[in-house]
Design a protein with these regions (language model features):
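Conserved N-terminal entry element of GNAT/NAT acetyltransferase domains
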Residues: 1-23, 164
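Conserved GNAT-fold acetyl-CoA-binding loop/helix
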Residues: 17-37
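A short helix-loop-beta-strand connector motif used in the catalytic cores of GNAT acetyltransferases and
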Residues: 38-60, 65-72
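Preference for well-ordered, secondary-structure-rich cores of eukaryotic proteins
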Residues: 41, 117-125, 129-134
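Conserved acyl-donor/pantetheine-binding loop and adjacent beta-alpha core of acyl/acetyltransferases
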Residues: 63-94
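Conserved beta-strand-loop-alpha-helix junction that forms the acyl-donor binding cleft
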Residues: 101, 128-140, 153-160
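Conserved acetyl-CoA-binding loop-helix of GNAT-fold acetyltransferases
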Residues: 101-119
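Conserved acetyl-CoA-binding loop of GNAT-fold acetyltransferases
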Residues: 143-153
């Protein structure tokens, strides 16, 4: 019983001590969801990379784009985020298009902290959507953490996290 309690205490210690930081460089080959997307793709046209940092280590990564509509493909997201960032405009929807973790529980924590950051600091944003692969793992992850399935597309699915 003590070992279990120690494991729980260790888990909550790292969760409480973690912070979300913006990254300008990652090893994209580590991305199990979209390794084909270059670093350059991930940091232009209002797209951002965030990492969940704990004890100087990045435990999870999420890549987001700002879009005016819900994209059904990476290509649509690319066009939408470019259009949303012309002439100082911004999209009203945050699209999390990849998330992965190096530590159990870090993916969930990253989604929730990113959602909070967006809600608190990006006042023009009114929705938090995913552009997820059509895999049981992605479906289970998002449903388990409270997202609602809003679209099933030919090559992807969209989930929406409540913004309240």
């Amino acid at each position: 019983m003590k070992k279990f309690k120690d494991n729980i205490d260790d888990f909550f210690k790292w969760v409480k001590g973690s912070e979300l930081v913006e990254l300008d460089d990652i090893d994209v080959s580590e991305d199990p969801v979209r390794p084909e997307l270059t670093l350059g793709f991930r940091i232009i046209h209002g797209r951002k990379i965030f990492g969940l940092k704990y004890n100087e280590e990045i435990e999870a990564i999420v890549c987001i784009a700002l879009c005016p509509e819900v994209p059904h493909t990476v290509r649509e997201m690319d066009y939408m985020s470019q259009a949303a960032n012309q002439d100082g405009k911004r999209g009203e929807i945050v699209v999390a298009y990849t998330v992965w973790s190096r530590k159990r529980g870090a993916g969930k924590q990253t989604i929730f902290i990113t959602k909070k950051l967006v809600k608190d600091e990006m006042k023009n944003i009114n929705r938090f959507i995913t552009l997820s692969p059509l895999t049981p793992i992605a479906t289970h992850f998002h449903i388990k953490h409270g997202a609602k399935l809003i679209n099933i597309n030919a090559t992807s699915q969209n989930f929406e996290y409540d913004f309240n």
